[in-house]
Amino acid sequence: MEAPLVKCLDEILDSGAVGVICADKDGLALHSAGQVQLRAAGVITALASLAKQIDPSCDTTPTIHLESDSLDVYIQQKEQVSLAVYSTPKK
């Protein structure tokens, strides 16, 4: 399972992201690459879980978009895995 995950995350980096991190349901980092901090894995998982509680009747998984002057972060949780993709903001 690890090789397909690493390949997928590397493809995300190749598409222009500056960092990517994948975490399990408990917030443990499964893999990271690029400019990310491993300690963010737990926060990413918690944010993704909380976002689902905003509208529990919704069938789709929410995507969280955090923006700053220097970084955009997209977070989404599917089944038992949370993913965050870091990119530079479009100007």
From Swiss-Prot:
Keywords: Cytoplasm, Lysosome. Gene3D superfamilies: Dynein light chain 2a, cytoplasmic. InterPro entries: LAMTOR5. GO terms for biological process: cellular response to amino acid stimulus; negative regulation of apoptotic process; positive regulation of TOR signaling; protein localization to lysosome; regulation of cell size. It comes from the Eukaryota. The keyword rRNA-binding does not apply. Belongs to the LAMTOR5 family. Regulator of the TOR pathway, a signaling cascade that promotes cell growth in response to growth factors, energy levels, and amino acids. As part of the Ragulator complex, may activate the TOR signaling cascade in response to amino acids. This is Ragulator complex protein LAMTOR5 homolog. The lineage of its organism: Eukaryota, Metazoa, Ecdysozoa, Arthropoda, Chelicerata.
